[in-house]
Curated annotation (Swiss-Prot):
Keyword annotations: Hydrolase
InterPro entries: AB_hydrolase_fold, FrsA-like, FrsA_esterase
Protein name (database record): Hydrolase LUC6
Active-site residues per Swiss-Prot or TrEMBL entry: 238
Taxonomic placement: Eukaryota, Fungi, Dikarya, Ascomycota, Pezizomycotina
């Protein structure tokens, strides 16, 4: 695979953005010009370059809007939204940085400006949560000429470890709407504006989050918008794959797509550490203080490690690397939870992910779906960048959409005429 940046981490995040170009999230020339202004491993240059490009796209959108060019304005606003999102992404080692929230708000605002000019419709929704808080959501509805017969099948899409609701559009609604599916996406605790504005932290028992989301989608939105609650799927990618499987134990979920999700977060992180170090800490032979000191020293010379632990501390609401490791132990599907899933399930893996392997995750997840027969569960392992081999199918979103919706069509009995 061609490297735009020498480091795997920066290259992956660049491809993550460039891969949205088919769905209005980026322009190839703009991305290449922006990459030329970024110093590999330098989050400040990353922020400045993408923020400047977001402002340029915003100006183009305003210019198009002023002359009545709806498509030009929509595309410009949506690109600006994605560039704003990318700009703050690598600042998460210092979550108190005010640029994180301001860029996230700018991303959401630009996205909404663009979407009202596109085919189809979207409704902004607030989901009642806990402690008087709400979770921001969007219901995307297909245009009438894309709708299938009968009620509208719906996909409830959850984010993951580091996504925002605006980014979720490229993975879900962009493929769903032309195929006649509605999509409901949301920022849960630890995600998007729920984290940045409301300081709600990620939780392992995601079924408690999606239970409230399903209450609202089924009880409030479905009757008004003709949604088919008997053809309701849940979808998530990367950590969202884990979260979607937590949601799938709810009997109201009729199908689930878990894209490249982990089986056990702690096991993945543990496998990347020297055995003497992690086992010494687990046994108590090495103290929290020593563990934290070692991680902090390594992070001072390895930006990817610094970002991973910095972002983890933020989304989990903890203070130290040792606290991160203890929290990760709660994010596991190894306790028999998968046996609770009774709905048809599509599991995917990424053979070329630099985070974790299908052998660690996709295969044991698939094998642990003990309540499902062979016809009720399906496994797809993507290989190479063009074949869905990168984490969350980065760079192969069209293929992911094809695989996912072909499987959902079959599962939900949706028949389409040959073209």
């Amino acid at each position: 695979m061609h490297q735009i940046f020498p480091s795997t981490f920066f290259n992956f995040e660049f491809l993550r953005l460039l891969g949205t170009a088919p769905y209005l999230g980026a322009e190839t020339g703009e991305c290449l010009a922006t990459a030329a202004r970024i110093k590999d491993g330098d989050p400040e240059s990353w922020y400045q370059a993408w923020y400047e490009q977001a402002q340029k796209a915003l100006a183009l959108a305003d210019e198009a809007k002023a002359v009545g060019d709806g498509p030009g304005a929509a595309w410009g606003y949506i690109r600006a939204s994605n560039y704003f999102r990318a700009s703050e992404f690598l600042l998460h080692c210092t979550p108190e940085d005010p640029r994180i929230l301001s860029s996230a708000v700018a991303s959401a605002d630009a996205f909404d400006k663009g979407w009202i000019l596109l085919d189809g419709s979207v409704r902004k929704v607030e989901i009642p949560y806990e402690g008087g808080n709400t979770l921001p959501g969007r219901l995307y509805l297909p245009a009438p000429h894309h709708q299938v017969s009968g009620k509208i099948p719906v996909v409830v899409q959850t984010g993951g470890f580091d996504s925002t609701q605006e980014e979720l559009y490229y993975y879900g609604a962009a493929g769903a709407l032309p195929r006649g599916y509605a999509v409901f996406s949301f920022d849960g605790p630890g995600q998007g504006l729920s984290l940045r504005k409301d300081k709600l932290y990620l939780r392992p028992d995601w079924e408690h989050v999606t239970s409230k989301v399903l209450d609202h989608v089924i009880g409030e939105l479905a009757p008004v918008h003709n949604l088919d609650v008997d053809r309701l799927a849940v979808f998530g990618a990367s950590l969202g794959g884990y979260l979607s499987l937590r949601a799938a134990a709810d009997p109201r979920v009729k199908a689930v797509v878990s894209c490249d999700g982990p089986l056990d977060l702690f096991d993945i992180t543990r496998s990347r550490m020297p055995p003497w170090f992690i086992n010494g800490w687990l046994s108590g032979w090495l103290s929290d203080g020593f563990f934290n000191w070692v991680i902090d020293r390594l992070a001072s010379v390895n930006f990817q490690l610094a970002w991973e632990f910095g972002h983890s501390k933020w989304v989990y609401g903890v203070k130290t690397p040792a606290d991160v490791m203890r929290t990760m132990q709660k994010f596991s599907l190894k306790d028999g939870y998968l046996s609770k899933i009774k709905c048809p399930t599509l599991i995917t893996g990424a053979a070329d992910s630099f985070y974790f392997t299908p052998q660690q995750n996709a295969h044991p997840i698939f094998d642990s779906l003990s309540a499902l027969g062979p016809a009720e569960k399906h496994l797809w392992i993507g290989k190479d960048v063009e074949g869905g081999g990168l984490q969350a199918k980065i760079g192969a979103l069209a293929l992911m959409h094809h695989k996912m919706f072909a499987w959902l069509d079959e599962t939900f009995g949706i028949r389409r005429d040959e073209l």
